[in-house]
Amino acid sequence: AQGQLAKYAQIQPGVKGDTTINVLSTDVVFQADGCSRTASGTTTLTQRTISPGAVAVHEDLCMDSLSAKYTAVMLKQGLTAEKEEIPFAELYFAQKIAKVQDALGKAYWQGDTASGSANLNKFDGLDKLILAAGTAVNGNPTAITTGTGYTSGNIIGILLGMAELIPEAIAGADDLKLFVAPAQFLSYQRALADGNYFHYVSEGQTQSMPLIGFPNIEVVSDPGLTQSNNNIYLMRASNIYIGVDLPDEEANDVRSWYDPNDRIYKVTMAFRTGVNVAFPDEIVRFALV
């Protein structure tokens, strides 16, 4: 599991198939003390399901083809040696894993099993799951349109409006995150500069920064929301669950071998992963209309 979202979400290992997130909810009803008792209050156990998708990455590398594109310095001397190993393995695997992690970061938000995109149709992402739940708070009650969009002139008002709509039960939480696309984050940074809110800006804040007036809410730039439907989400980080079938130390498991029969170097990555939220009614969802 990787991408910006995975840095904040709860990682649930051992997910091989549909796996439940067990959610306990209870309330309290005070009564007058006395010699008798009457039971009151309600405790319920509800379940949300992580439905993981099986993901695989397969690639065949022909050293003959690569030798025409890379200098002799990068390729080992000798025809046989060239074929039996990747001379730039560290560079190759680092980039391959980074690309997989970036693609997962996008799928965790934009995934849709009905999508025509191979990178998005392995499991449903949060965009689809939160909308389908139908209980998230509408963060756009004034119906800002797609024609208006997000600008440095309205982004602060949009984010503050979402903060004011946050459910009372989580208003004081210390892990509240406003997930925005990088373009929206840049608009927020520009708005802070235009408004001379420089005391809210610290050096090196390229991925996240606090929301004006709400020190317990962090605005997070998430590349996984790039080229999406441009929704913005306000929720607790602890409300997000990413399911994986491998523990963290094995999450970057890569199998590679040289096949002497095909004279090809083969690479395979295979895993299961999925995502969901525990409390969709504790989310503020902003969608342009």
Regions found by a protein language model. Name each.
Residues 108-114, 172-181, 201-204:
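Short coil/turn segments at secondary-structure boundaries
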Residues 1-74:
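Assembly/oligomerization interface modules of large self-assembling protein complexes
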Residues 1-22, 26-27, 123-153, 187-289:
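Sequence/fold signature of self-assembling virion shell proteins
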